[in-house]
């Protein structure tokens, strides 16, 4: 089992825009004017960086009317055993991202193991590795509770996948943190966490310090998306850290 990703899934930002359906739950979201040319320039630069570091990736098409489609990890998660899981999305326009072409791509490369999409009809949500920060080596899932990260559904998923669930409450600007992966990340050796946003930080620290060296993140750093990080390995087996784009 490895914590690093050996291939990335990227979605071209052709529909990236302000999402009115997620604004109420995302404290980081601001209604600003989007510069499409700048967005594609950054996307192309990122691809060049991946190529330079010999990191493999696939580029998926963005379905129409899907402003957040560049975050596919919220609706689908793949695993080392060649399986994938589909997750329950809070926003209707995020469910569009499960397009036929994207599902066909997944089915050609993986086998579906767990489908949680039926819980959308019950208003019960769990949004992939946005909700769950996975320690794949030690089989532990860390989750900040929110209306987009349901404890019961997370427990059901954890039991199916054989993970231990560690859940906690997190607040930024007096609002629940909508996704766990904005405030913490995990690599094979260390974990970056914003303890200042967590109510019972001692509980989380006692769990994660058993397996990882801790990198402390400030709320200001989290607001600048230092918590969105991923450990990637190149096809020459050299490792690289790239901060998440949000």
Segments and roles (model prediction):
Residues 53-93:
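Long, hydrophobic/aromatic-enriched structural stretches that serve as scaffold segments
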Residues 12, 88, 136, 143-147, ...:
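Short, structured patches in soluble enzyme cores that scaffold and shape functional sites
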Residues 236-243:
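Conserved small/polar residues in nucleotide/adenosyl-binding loops
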Residues 2, 69-73, 77-78, 126-136, ...:
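Structural signature of eukaryotic scaffold interfaces centered on beta-propeller domains
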Residues 1-61:
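N-terminal leader/transition segments
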Residues 91-150:
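Hydrophobic alpha-helical segments and helix pairs
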Residues 153, 166-229:
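Redox- and metal-dependent alpha/beta enzyme cores, enriched for Fe-S-associated oxidoreductases
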Residues 56-61, 113-119, 166-169, 215-217:
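General small-molecule cofactor/ligand-binding pocket signal
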